[in-house]
From Swiss-Prot:
Role of this protein: Carries out a dual function: signal transduction and activation of transcription. Required, in concert with transcription factor elt-3, for up-regulation of the vacuolar H(+)-ATPase and acceleration of lysosome maturation at molt. As part of the innate immune response to molting and injury of the adult epidermis, positively regulates the expression of epidermal antimicrobial peptides, such as nlp-29.
UniProt family annotation: Belongs to the transcription factor STAT family.
Keyword Plastid: no
Protein name in UniProt: Signal transducer and activator of transcription b
Gene deletion effect: RNAi-mediated knockdown almost completely abolishes induction of nlp-29 expression upon infection with Drechmeria coniospora, or upon injury, or in response to phorbol ester PMA.
Length: 567
């Protein structure tokens, strides 16, 4: 089974972690060239008819030939539209869903891909607009010969294309915790930004006709969202429990990258007093009311709905874990509000865990702190394999998602309230163990993690094998596999002996691990932090013990004369 997992893990990660070179969409170029060639044939025919160059007795067969060319134009347009909608925008949106659990840096890299997509939509939109314009004249000067039907087909294709060019380009987080001023709570997300963006559309005047126009946003339940799937014109009523602020924005065009409506610093406010359990099982969506004008008479009216999320009245880790699985693995773009699958591949889970860990350690400590946009540190292959193996994949290399939520992987000693020395051991499921270590890294080990001084996820046996390969004295900072929320320091001294020390997060709150490694005598004979980082250089140097020097006495004669008085 481990070989199956290894083969899966060797597959290149599908996540966007670093800037990529601009990719030329060869399929789009090919399809667009075919569309442009077909349009050119239509344009030549239209110019001939409208210029009066065709003799009266030749007009009817020429019109029939033009109509046949129009059908070919429509076929090419449909093919290009299908590519842009399915192979480009749908793929982008599905990846957007998966990356919505990742760091702002990773999400921003993906967001920038919309600039190229916007350009592709502009190119296709220009062809559609020019074709519609030509057909407008043809049906006016040559009525009742078939141009009305062609115009209707192209207009419907254009309407569809323009409406689905309106996207939720920035999604809300999977969990919004509404818990007062609990600034220190992990991953509390009081404020977030969303955005509606229109791709292309300049040829139809969408940018000029709708700049500064309002767009309203509503907080709706998933039940209302399900009704919208069947009726896009459904009257929307806000959730009775929460409201969203701000609930209105305006479309703005600040560059040549399309028109956008930004909803910055959004937050959820309670309308009534609520119990945690009353809302923990519910899902909510943001619904944006769209009403846009074009210069060709097409009106774009409808509603755009965000990915679902949970609103919690206070922290609830198991709900956060379930929403992590939903955003990572459910097919919410093609099948809105669909269920989470029962199994996923090891590679998919490894990528999702990596992005979630990166996002948690980038979470601001306080809701007053600004967002951090830095390139995250990647997991190495050993880390990914270690994590997925802890969830016990099956022989085919797939992981039951129930194991993420329910499989015990660690234990925690919980003291009884009545007696501090007594208590019971509690089993901790994978998600709680994993989230806790990410939280500890965020609060106590942030700099060391980014400097590569924390190895991270590693078993005791693997740590010992790793250390034996290093000829000098070395230590390795890792997360405990068995004991909940503990940091382990595995040390190989200069004699080759290996020992392990552990620290609870409360210990790290009292004194940083950096200071502990420099000042504790247990680590005084250690030269390196794994793999070959000089400990003193990395951590700032040890405090050398002060060597007591003999006092330089220079007694005078009076000193010796008085020595007899002392005896």
């Amino acid at each position: 089974m481990s070989s199956v997992v290894s083969d899966q893990m060797d597959i290149e990660s599908s996540s966007a972690f670093s800037p990529a070179e601009p990719v030329v969409d060869g399929a789009f170029v090919s399809k667009h060239n075919l569309s442009a060639e077909a349009y050119q044939g239509f344009k030549e025919c239209a110019d001939s008819l409208l210029s009066g160059k065709i003799a009266q007795n030749e007009q009817l067969p020429f019109i029939q030939r033009t109509l046949q060319i129009c059908e070919n134009v429509i076929l090419n347009f449909e093919d290009e539209k299908q590519h842009l909608m399915s192979d480009v925008l749908l793929v982008w949106a599905m990846k957007q869903q998966k990356l919505s659990i990742a760091t702002l840096h990773t999400q921003q890299l993906h967001y920038k891909e919309l600039d190229l997509i916007n350009l592709q939509f502009e190119y296709f939109g220009e062809l559609l607009q020019q074709t519609l314009s030509g057909l407008d004249y043809l049906k006016q000067y040559y009525p009742n010969v078939g141009f009305e039907e062609v115009h209707s087909k192209v207009r419907n294709l254009t309407h569809y294309f323009l409406y689905y060019s309106i996207i939720v380009s920035r999604q809300p987080p999977s969990v919004i915790v509404k818990c007062g001023e609990a600034e220190n709570h992990r991953r509390s997300r009081f404020w977030f930004n969303t955005e509606i963006r229109i791709l292309g559309g300049s040829a139809f005047g969408i940018d000029t006709n709708n700049e500064n126009s309002n767009v309203n946003c509503y907080l709706i339940t998933d039940e209302t969202a399900k009704q919208l799937l069947n009726n896009a014109y459904l009257d929307i009523f806000e959730s009775e429990e929460f409201c969203i602020e701000p609930n209105t924005s305006t479309f703005q065009k600040k560059d040549a990258r399309g028109i956008k409506a930004k909803f910055d610093d959004m937050k959820v406010a309670k309308k009534v007093a609520l119990r945690r359990d009353s809302v923990a099982t519910k899902r909510y969506c943001l619904c944006y009311n769209i009403q846009l004008q074009t210069n060709c008479g097409i009106e774009l009216v409808g509603k755009k709905v965000s990915l679902p999320f949970a609103v919690l009245v206070g922290p609830k880790a198991d709900v956060e874990a379930k929403l992590f699985l939903e955003r990572s693995f459910a097919d919410l773009v093609r099948h809105p509000l669909s269920d989470i699958p029962t199994h996923v591949s090891c590679a998919e889970m490894a990528d999702a865990l990596e992005m979630k860990f990166q996002a948690i350690i980038e979470t601001p400590q306080k809701n007053t702190d600004g967002p951090s946009v830095v390139q995250p540190r990647k997991f190495n292959m050993q880390t990914k394999q270690h994590l997925v193996m802890r969830m016990k994949p099956n022989n085919q290399g797939f992981l039951p998602l129930d194991n993420f939520m329910k499989l015990p992987v660690a234990e925690e000693f919980q003291h009884k309230k009545s007696a501090s020395a007594e208590g019971d051991w509690k089993l901790v499921p994978f998600y709680d163990w994993f989230f806790k270590l990410a939280e500890i890294t965020n609060k106590y080990l942030y700099s060391m993690w980014y400097d590569g001084l924390v190895y991270g996820f590693c078993s005791k046996e693997d740590a010992e094998n790793i250390l034996r390969c290093i000829p000098r004295s070395v230590l390795l900072v890792r997360f405990s596999d068995i004991e909940y929320g503990k940091i382990k320091i595995s040390v190989k001294n200069r004699n080759g002996e290996i020992r392990h020390h552990w620290y609870e997060h409360a210990d790290l709150n009292a004194r940083s691990l950096n200071s502990e490694l420099l000042s504790n005598h247990k680590f005084s004979d250690v030269d390196l932090i794994y793999p070959d980082i000089d400990l003193e250089v990395a951590l700032g140097g040890r405090n050398k013990p002060r060597i007591r020097l003999p006092r330089n006495l220079a007694p005078d004669e009076i000193y010796f004369d008085n020595q007899g008085a002392a005896t």
